[in-house]
């Protein structure tokens, strides 16, 4: 029974990952959707339906009607699947429904298969941050964990930067290159970060931070680190 128990446990974790991600983006304050490797839309949140779809139109038909965007997003998805340096890609200034959007495309490993998360942000808000009053609330428990990590003598002063980059889906190879540290240092810090947040891997960490409504702050920090290196 033990091998079967392991298979059942692995299958349950895969279901939990997809269910948790679906539950999180359902209440997300931006249009968002999940696709599988075949291009099938597994889930679209309410704002995605309200922003892009008509009552009798499927997400697949809507995407095919957006010819330029369809080609661009397909290429971006392939990059998210294949690029060893990062599993997060941004598509900027896409014009849909009379608005410009910046779209984050992020891959998650669900068992042996990848799923892709799209999130749509108002491009004007992303581009003109100074004039955008973004309400970012960082919960006390997140602040306390970040503070404790910073004070941990077993890691370097780069631990917070590793946290912000790692939590947005960026690989250890890319983190090492951006921060000019070794890959082993990045992995060591990531392991400690997961321990502090009581998760076992990157996907669980990202979903936890989505659930904490921490993602806006996280992306801003990560982009700031990348742009200043």
UniProtKB/Swiss-Prot annotation:
InterPro entries: Sig_transdc_resp-reg_C-effctor, TraJ, WH-like_DNA-bd_sf. It comes from the Bacteria. GO terms for molecular function: DNA binding. GO terms for cellular component: cytoplasm. Its main location: cytoplasm. The keyword Transcription regulation applies. One of its GO terms (biological process) is regulation of DNA-templated transcription. NCBIfam families: PRK13719.1-4. This is Protein TraJ. The gene is traJ.
């Amino acid at each position: 029974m033990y091998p079967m128990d392991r298979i059942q446990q692995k299958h349950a974790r895969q279901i939990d990952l997809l269910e948790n991600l679906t539950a999180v983006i359902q209440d997300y304050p931006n249009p968002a959707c999940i696709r599988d490797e075949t291009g099938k839309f597994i889930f679209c949140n309410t704002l995605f339906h309200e922003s892009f779809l008509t009552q009798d139109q499927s997400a697949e038909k809507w995407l095919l009607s957006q010819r330029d965007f369809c080609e661009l997003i397909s290429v971006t998805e392939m990059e998210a699947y294949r690029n060893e340096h990062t599993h997060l890609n941004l598509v900027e200034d896409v014009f849909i429904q009379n608005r410009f959007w910046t779209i984050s495309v992020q891959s998650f490993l669900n068992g042996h298969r990848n799923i892709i998360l799209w999130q749509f942000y108002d491009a004007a808000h992303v581009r003109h941050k100074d004039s955008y009053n973004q309400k970012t609330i960082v919960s006390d428990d997140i602040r306390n964990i970040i503070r404790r990590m910073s004070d941990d003598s077993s890691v370097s002063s780069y631990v917070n930067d590793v946290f912000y980059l790692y939590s947005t889906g960026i690989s250890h190879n890319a983190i090492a290159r951006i921060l000019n540290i070794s890959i082993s240092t990045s992995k060591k810090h990531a392991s400690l970060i997961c321990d502090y947040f009581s998760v076992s891997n990157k996907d669980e960490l990202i979903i936890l931070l989505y659930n904490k409504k921490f993602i806006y702050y996280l992306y801003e920090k990560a982009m700031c680190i990348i742009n200043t290196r």
